C-alpha cells in the first residue's frame, strides 16, 4: 500500500519520537517469517516494552536523524523489522534472540546502542544485559558485601579471643545481709 506525503510524515514523526526515547535499536531481516510468528513476536514485544515496526528504510533513516541511532542510517538496507527497546536496553536483543531460535529466517542486521553501531553478532551481548531489577540486585549485593565482610571479621576476632558468647556471661554475686 502506497503512502501519501502526509502519511509518510506521520510515520517519520512517530518513529522519530520512539527513536528519541529508545535505549537500543535492532534492525532484523524478517523475510520468510509467518504471520503467526510475527503476531506472537508483536505480542511479546508489547509485554516487554519493545516497539516493533516494519517501515520503508528511507522513512526509518529520516526518523533516526538527530538521534543516537543516526549511525545506523547507512546500514538500513533490505526488508527490515525495527525493534526499539523502550524500557531496558537489552529487551529488544532478548526478543530477537528468542524468536531467532525458532525461526532461522529472522536475522539481526543492525545493532545500535548509545550512539554506537555494533556488528549483528552483538545481539547476544545486548540480550545478555541484565534487566533493571537484576542490575539493582547486583548493585545491592556489591554495596552490602563490605559490611558483611566486616561483620565476619569482627566475629572471627571475637571467636579467637575468647570464645564469643561465653566471654559475655555475667558473674553471679553473693549478697550479704
UniProtKB/Swiss-Prot annotation:
Q: Tell me which InterPro entries the record gives.
A: Ribosomal_uL10, Ribosomal_uL10-like_sf, Ribosomal_uL10_bac, Ribosomal_uL10_bac_type
Name the keywords, alphabetized.
Answer: Ribonucleoprotein, Ribosomal protein, RNA-binding, rRNA-binding
GO MF term set: large ribosomal subunit rRNA binding
Its GO CC terms?
ribonucleoprotein complex; ribosome
Which GO terms of type biological process are on file?
Answer: translation
**Pfam families for this protein:** Ribosomal_L10
Q: Which CDD domains match?
A: Ribosomal_L10
Describe the protein's quaternary organization and the partners it interacts with.
Part of the ribosomal stalk of the 50S ribosomal subunit. The N-terminus interacts with L11 and the large rRNA to form the base of the stalk. The C-terminus forms an elongated spine to which L12 dimers bind in a sequential fashion forming a multimeric L10(L12)X complex.
Q: Give the NCBIfam families listed for this entry.
A: PRK00099.1-1
Family, similarity comment? Belongs to the universal ribosomal protein uL10 family.
| Function noted in UniProt | Forms part of the ribosomal stalk, playing a central role in the interaction of the ribosome with GTP-bound translation factors.
What is the protein's given name? Large ribosomal subunit protein uL10
Species whose genome carries this gene: Xanthomonas euvesicatoria pv. vesicatoria (strain 85-10) (Xanthomonas campestris pv. vesicatoria)
This protein's gene is called rplJ
